[in-house]
Amino acid sequence: MDVIKRFMLFDKTILVSVISAKELVDKAIKIHSLSRTAAAALGRTLIVGAYMGTELKDDKQKLSITINGGGPLGRIVVLSDYGAKVRGYVENPAVELPLNGKGKLDVGGGVGKNGYISVIKDLGLKEPYSGRCPIVDGEIANDFAYYFTVSEQQPSAVALGVLAADNECVSAGGIIVNALPGA
């Protein structure tokens, strides 16, 4: 069962969110026939989208995430709404790259490093909030840590992981640590 748990630490100056998303990523793999590299990239982005969706306040609010790093996977787009209902796609779902020098999936090579992350939040105001920042390394976790710190002024550490086999998700989840005001 997928779940997001949040914990306040150190006199409520640190928020830790732990996300389990195996079912979400497994469904995406099956719907889009994702390669392992595409599954890792889209899965990591879906996890962040679900996390960000939990911050929306009512069912009229929604957000979109676009990652465009110029890599062979193409754009990654994720939509989330109130209650962390999330969906997304990757432009080139069949792209599979050789393992990187550490023996891991080369998500950074698939996403690319020449581009940006864009987040648009429709909070029901006159104009949607739009944040954009450059991609750091294409591995998605570091890119969102940078995005949260620079664009949302919330210093963060982000760890995301997707373990994908042929046409299935073995495990998927993340940990997001945010420094709150006064930390």
Protein language model features and the residues they cover:
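Interaction interfaces in information-processing and related assembly proteins
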Residues: 2-183
